[in-house]
């Protein structure tokens, strides 16, 4: 495909695969996976990744923020106040305003607390941030986030780190159909076919971390994910055949001996 870019908050990207920066053996492996994935955006947990302590290994020594768009996230935050404070620190440290917001409800499921998420979204927008928001696969709540100023909606495919794949494709499709901002599947992808399905549903992109980082060969899996995302997008643009209850022969018999 010649030009099939997508845009969020005025930023344009060619790659529809966003890669995380956690759970890798080391920063070198993380950097190799990011390169193999062809990613342009990497998401960074502000509370867990070293971005400022020069006496210790730093992510920026391996993944150059001048070459990649760093997307600070609020992983580990369980209320709006924590999340907003974390992103204020990120802006002070690196000037970032395009951010990924996630406010978790509990440690067992890491399911989003949508009341706190909406509250944090409203605060961040007022403070000049451009939040891409992790959320439940609820079309009504997704619309409320968009109305509150979210620049992208990021419904989960399944619980974070579960690798269960897309559990509710119907709701994801409803979110896509109603949205006027990009929709990205965030969380739950386990293998390449999951990523392909996300794009086949019409999602603009997909974000993943564990599916690559915990693969037996993370760099090879990153390559697989890149191909899957591209294939899924092409299939969506091509338009799949309709589903039928009964068979329809590929080779008609009319006119044959």
Curated annotation (Swiss-Prot):
Domain of life: Bacteria
GO BP terms: thiamine diphosphate biosynthetic process
CDD domains: ThiG (cd04728)
Gene Ontology molecular function: any one: thiazole synthase activity
Reactions accelerated catalytically: [ThiS sulfur-carrier protein]-C-terminal-Gly-aminoethanethioate + 2-iminoacetate + 1-deoxy-D-xylulose 5-phosphate = [ThiS sulfur-carrier protein]-C-terminal Gly-Gly + 2-[(2R,5Z)-2-carboxy-4-methylthiazol-5(2H)-ylidene]ethyl phosphate + 2 H2O + H(+)
Subunit structure: Homotetramer. Forms heterodimers with either ThiH or ThiS.
Protein name: Thiazole synthase
Organism: Zymomonas mobilis subsp. mobilis (strain ATCC 31821 / ZM4 / CP4)
């Amino acid at each position: 495909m010649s030009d099939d870019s997508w845009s969020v908050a005025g930023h344009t990207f060619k790659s529809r695969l966003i890669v995380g920066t956690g759970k890798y053996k080391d920063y070198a492996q993380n950097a190799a996976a990011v390169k193999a994935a062809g990613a342009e955006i990497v998401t960074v947990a502000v509370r867990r990744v070293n971005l400022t302590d020069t006496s210790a290994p730093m992510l920026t020594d391996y993944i150059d923020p001048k070459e990649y768009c760093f997307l600070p996230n609020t992983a580990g935050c369980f209320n709006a106040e924590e999340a907003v404070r974390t992103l204020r620190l990120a802006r002070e440290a690196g000037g970032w305003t395009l951010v990924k917001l996630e406010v978790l409800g509990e440690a067992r499921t890491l399911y989003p607390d949508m009341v706190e998420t909406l509250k944090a979204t409203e605060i961040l927008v007022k403070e000049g941030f451009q939040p891409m928001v992790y959320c439940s696969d609820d079309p009504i709540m997704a619309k409320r986030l968009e109305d509150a100023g979210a620049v992208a909606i990021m419904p989960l495919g399944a619980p974070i780190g579960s690798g269960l794949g897309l559990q509710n494709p119907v709701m994801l499709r409803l979110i896509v159909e109603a949205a006027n901002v990009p929709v990205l599947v965030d969380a739950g992808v386990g293998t390449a076919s999951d990523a392909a399905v996300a794009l086949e549903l019409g999602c603009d992109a997909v974000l993943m971390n564990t599916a690559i980082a915990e693969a037996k060969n993370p760099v090879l899996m990153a390559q697989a994910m890149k191909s899957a995302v591209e294939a899924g997008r092409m299939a969506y643009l091509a338009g799949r055949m309709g589903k039928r209850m009964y068979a329809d022969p590929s080779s008609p018999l009319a006119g044959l001996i």
